[in-house]
Amino acid sequence: MSLHFLYYCSEPTLDVKIAFCQGFDKQVDVSYIAKHYNMSKSKVDNQFYSVEVGDSTFTVLKRYQNLKPIGSGAQGIVCAAYDAVLDRNVAIKKLSRPFQNQTHAKRAYRELVLMKCVNHKNIISLLNVFTPQKTLEEFQDVYLVMELMDANLCQVIQMELDHERMSYLLYQMLCGIKHLHSAGIIHRDLKPSNIVVKSDCTLKILDFGLARTAGTSFMMTPYVVTRYYRAPEVILGMGYKENVDIWSVGCIMGEMVRHKILFPGRDYIDQWNKVIEQLGTPCPEFMKKLQPTVRNYVENRPKYAGLTFPKLFPDSLFPADSEHNKLKASQARDLLSKMLVIDPAKRISVDDALQHPYINVWYDPAEVEAPPPQIYDKQLDEREHTIEEWKELIYKEVMNSEEKTKNGVVKGQPSPSGAAVNSSESLPPSSSVNDISSMSTDQTLASDTDSSLEASAGPLGCCR
């Protein structure tokens, strides 16, 4: 189906048919909703029931009905469900064995804290969090409730996007990243399966299980993101800062243009070779920044001149130029050339990317300059605790959220007429989601990803 731009420099739309999960950003009075739907607060807040979902048992509040599995990963299982209180479809993620070890427990705590703090239209936020257990001693399950979205970027990448849609999707990615960076949060796991969209072209970034608050130490484990989207400084163990996420955006943008992964390495060595074959061997100045053993290996690899960006991304790969004089192949290619830079010191920043001509046609100060999230646990990534201590911290977070819900305020709102997901309709029988904490594209290696259900998408088009 051919795509066309509905309104000149208005927000474009997508016609997508897959359900995915994301977050809410509004508030609504629980007591009002409970009254509206003839539900008492006790029924809304306190009654649970159990249902078998695949190989797992979900014990959820009775407000959540018609559970259907839509994804699984190392950190949990995701179900689609109907929320009778908010009168809309939602996604429920059950964390998988969050207290199995210190790493799992710390990751669960970090994900929960960051999701509760972040509040931006292009980033996931929690609608609800609960546990069926009533005491700390019994506590073992954590459920996160989020909005159900229409598709992830894996499906969208395979479509023929015009410049308006491509530019607008990239703009929203950058807005979300800037919001995280404003609080010193590095995402580190940006990839198509962790970015979701609605048919109105709204985009949201998923997953904070691997996000990190920026601190004094940047020498972190390199195994933090699906290999194909890992920045060179991660591959080479150099340590990294915020613009590590910009490389990932560049890889995603390049994949939108080529409809295939840019650097599909089998391992770190092959990944590095794929990068330098296309972009060229970096200069001696960059080599000096490497650790001696890594530098010795890199300097002894064959030298590549690399290809020019017009050869890497010729005009024939891009859609026809837009009527807008900034949305054309030459500008898109220029942005790619600034993001896909091996040396992070020379790579474009998120602020400069938002000001790039291919992106700034959408610039809205309210979206770009939104107040940074208030991370109340400043030592989030420096904390070290026993499993029992992590468990107690998570339990307190869950109890705090449940108390706020009982007091009458929860995130979310009933679906308006004409919403992207019509809650009056039944849930899709075979929808698919990439788990917001650990899932990735089909082409990744088994060591980097977990299983996901079969995904399919309808054609992209314009929704009225």
Swiss-Prot record:
InterPro entries linked: Kinase-like_dom_sf (IPR011009), MAP_kinase (IPR050117), MAP_kinase_CS (IPR003527), MAPK_JNK (IPR008351), Prot_kinase_dom (IPR000719), Ser/Thr_kinase_AS (IPR008271)
Residue ranges with Low complexity bias: 423-432
Residue ranges of the region described as Disordered: 405-464
UniProt-listed GO biological process terms: cellular senescence; Fc-epsilon receptor signaling pathway; JNK cascade; protein phosphorylation; regulation of circadian rhythm; response to light stimulus; rhythmic process; signal transduction
Catalytic activity: L-seryl-[protein] + ATP = O-phospho-L-seryl-[protein] + ADP + H(+); L-threonyl-[protein] + ATP = O-phospho-L-threonyl-[protein] + ADP + H(+)
Record-listed Phosphothreonine modification sites: 221
Annotated localization: Cytoplasm; Membrane; Nucleus; Mitochondrion
Active-site annotation: 189 (proton acceptor)
Chain sites annotated for binding ATP: 70-78, 93
Annotated GO CC locations: cytoplasm; cytosol; mitochondrion; nucleoplasm; nucleus; plasma membrane
Covalent lipid sites (S-palmitoyl cysteine): 462-463
All residue ranges annotated as the Protein kinase domain in the record: 64-359
Phosphotyrosine: residues carrying this PTM: 223
Keyword check for Membrane: yes
Named cofactor requirement(s): Mg(2+)
UniProt cross-references to SMART domains, sorted A to Z: S_TKc
EC numbers, comma separated: 2.7.11.24
Record PTM text: Dually phosphorylated on Thr-221 and Tyr-223 by MAP2K4 and MAP2K7, which activates the enzyme. MAP2K7 shows a strong preference for Thr-221 while MAP2K4 phosphorylates Tyr-223 preferentially. Weakly autophosphorylated on threonine and tyrosine residues in vitro.
Tissue expression per record: Specific to a subset of neurons in the nervous system. Present in the hippocampus and areas, cerebellum, striatum, brain stem, and weakly in the spinal cord. Very weak expression in testis and kidney.
UniProtKB keywords: ATP-binding, Biological rhythms, Chromosomal rearrangement, Cytoplasm, Epilepsy, Intellectual disability, Kinase, Lipoprotein, Membrane, Mitochondrion, Nucleotide-binding, Nucleus, Palmitate, Phosphoprotein, Serine/threonine-protein kinase, Transferase
Polar residues bias spans: 433-454
Family: Belongs to the protein kinase superfamily. CMGC Ser/Thr protein kinase family. MAP kinase subfamily.
Oligomeric form and interacting partners: Interacts with MAPKBP1. Interacts with MAPK8IP1/JIP-1 and MAPK8IP3/JIP-3/JSAP1. Interacts with SPAG9/MAPK8IP4/JIP4. Interacts with HDAC9. Interacts with ARRB2; the interaction enhances MAPK10 activation by MAP3K5. Interacts with SARM1. Interacts with JUND; interaction is inhibited in the presence of MEN1.
Protein name according to UniProt: Mitogen-activated protein kinase 10
